[in-house]
Amino acid sequence: VIEVVYLRTPFSAGNATT
């Protein structure tokens, strides 16, 4: 569900690439 987290937090978008 890391993709959802990145959608909520633009800062986490960098980690969403995993």
Curated annotation (Swiss-Prot):
Gene Ontology CC annotation, any one: host cell
Keyword Phosphoprotein appears in the UniProt entry: yes
Induction and repression of expression: Expressed in the late phase of the viral replicative cycle.
Keyword Phosphoprotein: yes
Subcellular localization(s) per the UniProt record: Virion; Host nucleus
InterPro entries, alphabetized: Adenovirus_Pll_hexon_sub3 (IPR016110)
Other facts noted in the record for this chain: All late proteins expressed from the major late promoter are produced by alternative splicing and alternative polyadenylation of the same gene giving rise to non-overlapping ORFs. A leader sequence is present in the N-terminus of all these mRNAs and is recognized by the viral shutoff protein to provide expression although conventional translation via ribosome scanning from the cap has been shut off in the host cell.
Quaternary structure and interacting proteins, as annotated: Homotrimer. Interacts with the capsid vertex protein; this interaction binds the peripentonal hexons to the neighboring penton base. Interacts with the hexon-linking protein; this interaction tethers the hexons surrounding the penton to those situated in the central plate of the facet. Interacts with the hexon-interlacing protein; this interaction lashes the hexons together. Interacts with host dyneins DYNC1LI1 and DYNC1I2; this interaction might be involved in intracellular microtubule-dependent transport of incoming viral capsid.
Protein purpose: Major capsid protein that self-associates to form 240 hexon trimers, each in the shape of a hexagon, building most of the pseudo T=25 capsid. Assembled into trimeric units with the help of the chaperone shutoff protein. Transported by pre-protein VI to the nucleus where it associates with other structural proteins to form an empty capsid. Might be involved, through its interaction with host dyneins, in the intracellular microtubule-dependent transport of incoming viral capsid to the nucleus.
Protein family according to the UniProt entry: Belongs to the adenoviridae hexon protein family.
Protein name: Hexon protein
UniProt organism field: Canine adenovirus serotype 1 (strain Utrecht) (CAdV-1)
